[in-house]
Swiss-Prot record:
It comes from the Eukaryota. Residues 448-459 have a biased composition (Acidic residues). The active site is at residue 67. Its EC number is 2.7.7.50. Second step of mRNA capping. Transfer of the GMP moiety of GTP to the 5'-end of RNA via an enzyme-GMP covalent reaction intermediate. SUPFAM superfamilies: DNA ligase/mRNA capping enzyme, catalytic domain, Nucleic acid-binding proteins. Disulfide bonds: none annotated. The lineage of its organism: Eukaryota, Fungi, Dikarya, Ascomycota, Saccharomycotina. This is mRNA-capping enzyme subunit alpha. CDD domains: Adenylation_mRNA_capping (cd07895). It catalyses: a 5'-end diphospho-ribonucleoside in mRNA + GTP + H(+) = a 5'-end (5'-triphosphoguanosine)-ribonucleoside in mRNA + diphosphate. GO terms for biological process: 7-methylguanosine mRNA capping.
């Protein structure tokens, strides 16, 4: 098992049912979403296939960033209307809500930096990944939240805005005041539960540059994420245009692990003695991988190894799961698992498939997930492995990607020029003395028109456009 891939835990208190339901309803209202309140609102990427190069990456503009191998979580920031206190909630993929105390998130100051201590974000929902990474100075592991999207900011839903606009709002209206608070008032931030950064977004044709950084990042990264620039946010479920690319060795599947210790017969005991058959815990057991077929797991107990699933337990389990494969655990790995002194049976495990031997290998436990991958997802992952796209395949179309990006960019500029020319002509007819049309008062001015690309660690003072 790869210890570097151990998923971090959310440093918060899981909220009870009624409070969770109340917050879920408030969030649905915030997003103007018709999705059920019990559905995780985060969008889910799909595995990359060879056809996606022509049909998607070459057909429209995409951002690319590294795929962090951490714990996916949304961050919801709201002010209690009664107490006027700001609350921060982390939402995992099972749609559980955890209150995280200790933060303060201010609004963007309009006059002076003192406003950082006087204002509070209210109604902001961010998408990101919790990850354990190595501090480059202290060399110690620290918890960090890497943000890569924004669904709402200060009560305004952004899900219908394009990705470029959402990132701009995230950078200017959330990350900049947060960063300024840490810069100007570090004593007020010393007890923050974890640090927060924005992920670097690059143009899709810079994918080779991003790929070269994967091994040198302070955290584990297992591929690339491609996000369409002009797309709205897909609330809940799979987004067929949000693509995750992994090297062949990084394509993984989540299963439920079922342990079967060998049964030994003590022939010295009477056949009627219930102790005649017993489990031999001195021998390495069999490790079965079960694939989820849908539905609620009616046997979701996490049991100790000393309490294997009974026949009736397995009958219940097989209403929603079926045996898929066995996993190879060598003696060294088995000793490591025993040394953990943790429950093993019934847990969700992330596994990779060795392409030469075809054997499944254990990577880590996924206690953040209630169920393994659905059988349809497993099938798609296996197809993705068979239809694998290498980094070389992607790099071969980089020039074409850049060329088509520039063509679309020039087309937009030409369309804007034509629009401005027509607007100027109409204005000249109505105002003979006017040589240049004034901007309409009801024409929206978007934040991203003048916004910055905030880096992972500090705002880009050079105001580089995303």
């Amino acid at each position: 098992m790869d210890n570097n891939r151990v998923a971090p835990e959310i440093p918060g208190l899981r909220q009870p049912g009624q409070i969770t339901n109340d917050i879920r309803m408030l969030m649905c209202k915030l997003l103007n979403s018709a999705k059920p309140a019990n559905t995780f609102p985060g969008s889910q990427p799909v595995s990359f296939h060879l056809a996606d190069i022509e049909e998607k990456l070459l057909a429209q503009d995409y951002y690319v960033c590294e795929k962090t191998d951490g714990l996916r979580a949304l961050m919801l920031i709201m002010v209690n209307p009664v107490t006027k206190e700001q609350g921060c909630f982390m939402i995992d993929r099972e749609n559980n809500y955890y209150m995280v105390n200790g933060f303060r998130f201010p609004c963007l100051p309009r006059a002076n930096k003192k406003e950082l201590l006087e204002t509070l974000q209210d109604g902001t929902l961010i998408d990101g990944e919790l990850v354990m990474q190595t501090n480059p100075v202290t060399k110690l592991k620290e918890l960090r939240y890497l943000m890569f999207d924004c669904l709402a900011v200060n009560g305004r839903s952004l899900v219908q805005s394009p990705t470029s606009s959402r990132l701009a709002h995230l950078g200017k209206e959330f990350f900049k005041p947060y960063y300024d608070l840490r810069s100007y008032f570090p004593d007020r931030c010393s007890t923050f539960p974890f640090k927060i950064s924005m992920k670097h977004m690059n143009f899709s044709y810079d994918l080779a540059k991003v790929a070269k950084t994967l091994d040198s990042l302070p955290h584990v990264s297992d591929g690339l994420i491609f996000t369409p620039v002009q797309a709205a946010y897909h609330i809940g479920g799979k987004d067929s245009y949000l693509l995750k690319w992994k090297p062949e060795v990084e394509n993984t599947v989540d299963f439920k692990l079922i342990i079967e210790p060998p049964v030994v017969e003590d022939k010295s005991l009477p056949k009627s003695d219930k102790n005649r058959f017993y489990y031999n815990y001195d021998v390495k057991p069999l490790f079965h991988l079960y694939v989820w077929q849908g539905g609620n797991d009616v046997n979701n107990r996490i049991q100790d190894f000393e309490q294997p699933f009974t026949k009736s337990d397995l009958e219940l389990l097989e209403r929603t799961y079926r045996k898929f494969a066995e996993i190879e655990i060598d003696d060294k790995q088995w000793n490591e698992l025993k040394a953990m002194e943790e429950p093993l049976n019934g847990r969700i495990v992330e596994c990779s498939k060795d392409q030469e031997s075809g054997a499944w290998k254990l990577l880590r436990f996924r206690d953040d997930k209630l169920n393994g991958n659905h059988v349809s997802v497993v099938q798609k992952v296996l197809e993705s492995i068979g239809d694998s796209v290498s980094l070389d395949d992607l790099e071969q179309v980089v020039d074409e990607m850049r060329s088509r990006w520039k063509e679309r960019e020039q087309g937009l500029k030409n369309a804007q020029k034509q629009f401005n020319h027509q607007a100027s002509a109409r204005s000249s007819l109505s105002q003979q003395h006017s040589t240049e049309p004034e901007q309409s008062q009801d024409q929206p001015k978007y934040v991203d028109d003048d916004d910055d690309n905030w880096s992972d660690d500090e705002p880009d003072t050079k105001r580089q456009k995303i």
